Curated annotation (Swiss-Prot):
It holds the Pfam family Herpes_UL14. InterPro entries: Herpes_UL14. It comes from Equine herpesvirus 1 (strain Ab4p) (EHV-1). Keywords: Host cytoplasm, Host nucleus, Virion, Virion tegument. GO terms for cellular component: host cell cytoplasm; host cell nucleus; viral tegument. This is Tegument protein UL14 homolog. Contributes to the nuclear transport of the viral transcriptional activator VP16 during the early phase of infection. Therefore, participates indirectly in the regulation of the immediate-early gene expression. Additionally, seems to be important for efficient nuclear targeting of capsids. Disulfide bonds: none annotated. It is found in: Virion tegument; Host cytoplasm; Host nucleus. Residues 198-211 have a biased composition (Polar residues). Residues 166-291 are annotated as: Disordered.
Amino acid sequence: MSFSARSRRQRLQLEEAYQREMIFKMHTLDLVREGVNKRSPAFVRAFTSAKEASLDLDRYMQAHSRVGRVEQNARALAQRVEAQAAVGEILDRHRRFLHPDFIDNFDSREDSIVEREERLGDVLSDINCDGGGGEVGDPQEWLGHEDEALLMRWMLEEAPRVSTRIAADPHSPRSTCPAPRKAPEDARCGARKPGEVNNYTPSAQPRSQETTVDHLASPDEGTRLGDRTRDLEHHSTAPMRTHPNVLASERRRLGVVHQREKSSESQESATRSKAIVGQEDQKWLGGIPPLSDEELQVDMGIPTMNGPIYPDYHRTA
């Protein structure tokens, strides 16, 4: 009988003994619940059968556990023998590593290899295989100084140019505010025919005066502002402009433009008058002495994320 057939037969015997023991035991307990006398032949027969089935189950379980334990020990020994055989085979295949002179031979061969490797490096340095100007450079740095300078020049040429129309103070928040976008020509000059609804775009809606005034104008914008003023006057007097809301918006824009022109002219006149007055015209009439220009200047410091940083001469002053 093979090992698998014998193992299957043992499992079936164990399962049969377990089922017989459960059946006779449940029958005995049912008789007890019904109140049958323990001297009754039915109870005696049921109890005796249940006891024999229980003893048979114990014997089968002990035999099965013994067989299983022996099988486990045999498998463990077989694994040890197989491992020993595998290790012996590996050692036989690499028995040259176990030779007494292997370590000395290995060290001498390693020294010879290192010496030849250094000699190869010396030959490479002598003939200069990298094609440089006399020195062997790093093979990873294939860009020279001239190449780096040329690349930097290309990067600077492709960088976006800084606009000149910014505020005088580079740290002013107005220098970072985007300029208000102009309304499209078709939206400003759009007209409706008689009997049609004026479907003007949202870009033609009136803008707030604060948005228009916040855009700082430089002195060299006088010509452009004059051209835009004439353009606005032309569009405001055109016969096609009939919508009252759009007309009021253009009038407000025209007023803001005139106000900006007047403010720029007043600033230019004040600058010219200040330039005419010299230091010799200022006289001290007594009392508190006047402050010098250096004392009147306010140093904003160097702006950082943690606040302004002042140079060392402020601390020593």
